[in-house]
């Protein structure tokens, strides 16, 4: 993927989505304010109530305007029939170039203790992650937005860091934030079901250029006021209830191998609700096998041969145990 090629600007595509989100703030139960430095803050679930619809729209913003997110019945888990479905005709750019929460943002000058991972089109403007060199992509924009899975807006030091890295003024930045415990927060996290498959494909060394289309779905997890339980539910929705289909321009051997490598069943930590796993490692994410962060089931279709390969399995019992 090269910036010189005719790839779309994810900021040009997602910008109107951000403005519509702000315009519809009253009906979506969002709170919009301006920080002291001029940045626009959109509270989608911290002090504001937020909504599932807000989470759905935020997920489309995270995808850089290159994906659709729908919520509908007939999901993969019978007892939790409403599912979040994500589709993108450019899944690599949408998921890895925009949606992936890869920008570590911390208050390094104050004592707020703020930390969040930045997601969305603003990542591609700053392009501070090594991933953008691999993708060969960097976006340019006069305004941009970042989505944060956080219980509050970023402090001035973090806003300044983002502005400097992006080459923009604080007033050109929009920060959309919602904690995992909220309706919007939990919805936008479950909407990462396709993204985790793309991240896993990247991790196992599959040729990203060969992934030409993708769709994924996972059950809409009920929010919980406890952070650990809320985080566990959103992870379990994907790890044990997520199903992804990738369409690849690859031969059968590579497609089959990818289907076998993608699912969460490849992880040594597979088999227990995420909250239990998290407690087992005393809350240290780095002690959890990274292979766990994957969809439960993977379907890979080779567009060269028409053959389809499958890996993994849904675990309705574990989803029930997590959501109950």
UniProtKB/Swiss-Prot annotation:
Q: Where does this protein have coiled-coil stretches?
A: none
Any single GO molecular-function term of the entry would be: methenyltetrahydromethanopterin cyclohydrolase activity
Q: Which organism is it from?
A: Methylobacterium organophilum
**Known function:** Catalyzes the hydrolysis of methenyl-H(4)MPT(+) to 5-formyl-H(4)MPT.
Q: Which cystines does this chain contain? A: none
Xref: CDD domains: MCH
Protein name stated in the entry:
Methenyltetrahydromethanopterin cyclohydrolase
According to the lineage, what is the superkingdom?
Bacteria
Task: List where the protein spans the membrane.
Answer: none
The primary gene name is: mch
Q: Which UniProt keywords apply?
A: Cytoplasm, Hydrolase, One-carbon metabolism
Q: What is its subcellular localisation?
A: Cytoplasm
Q: Which reaction does it catalyse?
A: 5,10-methenyl-5,6,7,8-tetrahydromethanopterin + H2O = N(5)-formyl-5,6,7,8-tetrahydromethanopterin + H(+)
The record's Gene Ontology biological-process terms are:
formaldehyde catabolic process; one-carbon metabolic process
Q: Where does it sit, as one GO cellular component term?
A: cytoplasm
The record describes its quaternary structure and partners as: Homodimer.
Read off the InterPro entries from this record.
Answer: METHMP_CycHdrlase
Q: What class of enzyme is it?
A: hydrolase
| Entry similarity comment | Belongs to the MCH family.
| Pathway(s) per entry | One-carbon metabolism; formaldehyde degradation; formate from formaldehyde (H(4)MPT route): step 3/5
Give the EC number: 3.5.4.27
